[in-house]
């Protein structure tokens, strides 16, 4: 394969991996540890 093809696949895989990690952090089990600033704020 050409170098550009391999580089494109590598970059696409990195972007997909970062997206999956972000979605897992936002909606998966680690989300229970995140605080909600709107609930923490007292009016």
Curated annotation (Swiss-Prot):
The keyword Thylakoid applies. Coiled coil: none annotated. GO terms for biological process: photosynthesis. Keywords: Membrane, Thylakoid, Transmembrane, Transmembrane helix. GO terms for cellular component: plasma membrane-derived thylakoid membrane. Its main location: membrane. Disulfide bonds: none annotated. It is a single-pass membrane protein. It is found in: Cellular thylakoid membrane. Pfam families: PsbN. The chain crosses the membrane at residues 3-23. PANTHER family: PROTEIN PSBN (PTHR35326:SF3). Belongs to the PsbN family. May play a role in photosystem I and II biogenesis. This is Protein PsbN 1. It comes from Microcystis aeruginosa (strain NIES-843 / IAM M-2473).
């Amino acid at each position: 394969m050409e170098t550009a093809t391999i580089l494109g696949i590598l970059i696409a895989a990195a972007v997909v991996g970062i997206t999956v990690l972000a979605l897992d952090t936002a909606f998966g089990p680690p989300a229970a540890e995140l605080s909600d600033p709107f609930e923490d704020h007292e009016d």
